[in-house]
Swiss-Prot record:
The chain crosses the membrane at residues 152-178. It comes from Bos taurus (Bovine). Keywords: Cell membrane, Disulfide bond, Glycoprotein, Immunoglobulin domain, Membrane, Phosphoprotein, Receptor, Signal, Transmembrane, Transmembrane helix. InterPro entries: CD28, CTLA4/CD28, Ig-like_dom_sf, Ig-like_fold, Ig_V-set. This is T-cell-specific surface glycoprotein CD28. The gene is CD28. GO terms for cellular component: external side of plasma membrane. Residues 19-151 are extracellular. The modification Phosphotyrosine is found at Y190, Y208.
Length: 219
């Protein structure tokens, strides 16, 4: 689309009639910060004249961006709701200040001037126009100011203190647990080493044998 607009912009202009006003516009304006100033320079002095100066968008000038009516001292402005536009009028120059432009508003723009009083009615011959190329804005992270970094460092310090306190509590609980475990083991060993009272012993009886009668052997 941009190439087509460039081709339209550089077509040779048609020969201007005697009752037409010439207008000079920049061939192309590149917008990087969503705002641009478009100056329309005319070969006609607007001082003490009743006029209407307007800016149109599109190759067929289908959309009126903004316009100013009246005279040099008391201009009345009207603006399309889709644009943020203000107008400044000079003796031979009308400047349109466009702000908050979007990428989809890239197009060719035409200046138009109509002299309403005194007669006769005169307007400008259509110029080659100005291509306004709106680039997409990429926001870069701004460096942090010292004031904005204070809450961040305060949060870091608080978190550090909490982590250190948690570590101390964990170490203390671990030491207590180890000491309790060691004490239980020592008590268990002491109980195992306590002398026990011997139980009743079994008596071993010799098997009974009848007593021998030695007197019988003697006789």
């Amino acid at each position: 689309m941009l190439r087509l607009l460039l081709a339209l912009n550089f077509f040779p202009s048609i020969q201007v009639a005697e009752n037409k006003i010439l207008v000079k516009q920049s061939p192309m304006l590149v917008v990087n910060d969503n705002e641009v100033n478009l100056s329309c320079k005319y070969t006609y002095n607007l001082f003490s004249k009743e006029f209407r100066a307007s800016l149109y968008k599109g190759a067929d000038s289908a959309v009126e961006v903004c316009a100013v009516n009246g005279n040099h001292s008391h201009p009345l402005q009207s603006t399309n709701k889709e644009f943020n536009c203000t107008v400044k009028v000079g003796n031979e120059t009308v400047t349109f200040y466009l702000q908050d432009l979007y990428v989809n508003q890239t197009d060719i723009y035409f200046c138009k001037l109509e002299v309403l009083y005194p007669p006769p009615y005169i307007d400008n011959e259509k110029s080659n126009g100005t291509i306004i190329h709106v680039k997409e804005k990429h926001l870069c992270p701004s460096p942090r100011s010292p004031e904005s970094s204070k809450p961040f460092w305060a949060l870091v310090v608080v978190n550090g203190v909490l982590v250190f306190y948690s570590l101390l509590v964990t170490v203390a609980l671990s030491n207590c647990w180890m000491k309790n475990k060691r004490n239980r083991m020592l008590q268990s060993d002491y109980m195992n080493m306590t002398p026990r009272r011997p139980g009743p012993t079994r008596r071993h009886y010799q098997p009974y044998a009848p007593a021998r009668d030695f007197a019988a052997y003697r006789s």
